[in-house]
Amino acid sequence: MEIACLDLEGVLVPEIWIAFAEKTGIDALKATTRDIPDYDVLMKQRLRILDEHGLKLGDIQEVIATLKPLEGAVEFVDWLRERFQVVILSDTFYEFSQPLMRQLGFPTLLCHKLEIDDSDRVVGYQLRQKDPKRQSVIAFKSLYYRVIAAGDSYNDTTMLSEAHAGILFHAPENVIREFPQFPAVHTYEDLKREFLKASSRSLSL
C-alpha cells in the first residue's frame, strides 16, 4: 500500500503570498519558506504586514480566486490518483485553499487554520502541530503505508527525509545543493518517472 504526499504551493499551484504581493505591490510579502525557513517567524512577519496595510482575509481570497494550478498540475494529480492514494501536505490554510483545491478535484488536504476576527482581520493562526508534514508521514508509516513524497522547499525536507522516498520538484538551486540525497526534477513527466521508480509496484506511465 502506497501513499503519495505532495506539497501544494510551488508544486501544484503558484505561491499564494507571492501572487498576493504582486497584486498589492507589497514586496515584503514575497518572502516564503525558501527565504525564511522558520515558518513561525515568516507568518508573524506576514500578519504584521497585513495589519500595517489594513488588508483583510477577503482581500487575500479575492486574489486567490484569480489563481490557476500550474500548467500540467491537474493532469498530473489525476495521473497520480489512478496509481496512488494522494494526500496534499501543505503549510497553507484551509481559508486560502478552497478555490485552488476545487480546480484540482479536491484531493485530501492536511494544512493549518487562520484565526479571523469579526471585522475579517487575520489575527492569528493555528498550526496543526509542530513539523506537521513529517508527523503526517510518520502517521502513515505507522499504518504500514509506503510513503513517497515530493516538495520544493526547506519546509518539505523533513517530510522527504521521513518518507521511504523523497523527491525535490521545482526546487531552487540552494535547496538542491543543500539536499543532494534527493533526486531533483523540474517537469511533471520527470516527476511521474520518479514516483514510478520509487514505487514498490510495477507501474507504467
Swiss-Prot record:
Cofactor(s) required, per the database record: Mg(2+)
Enzyme Commission number(s) from the entry: 3.1.3.3
Pathway: Amino-acid biosynthesis; L-serine biosynthesis; L-serine from 3-phospho-D-glycerate: step 3/3
Pfam families with a match to the protein in the record: Hydrolase
Catalysed reactions listed for this entry: O-phospho-L-serine + H2O = L-serine + phosphate; O-phospho-D-serine + H2O = D-serine + phosphate
Cofactor note (record): Binds 1 Mg(2+) ion per subunit.
Active site residues per record: D7 (nucleophile), E9 (proton donor)
Annotated GO MF terms: 4-amino-4-deoxychorismate synthase activity; L-phosphoserine phosphatase activity; magnesium ion binding; phosphoserine:homoserine phosphotransferase activity
Binding site for Mg(2+): D7, E9, D152
SUPFAM superfamilies: HAD-like (SSF56784)
One CC-aspect GO term: cytoplasm
Family named by the database record: Belongs to the thrH family.
Protein's name in the database: Phosphoserine phosphatase ThrH
UniProt source species: Pseudomonas aeruginosa (strain ATCC 15692 / DSM 22644 / CIP 104116 / JCM 14847 / LMG 12228 / 1C / PRS 101 / PAO1)
Gene name as annotated: thrH
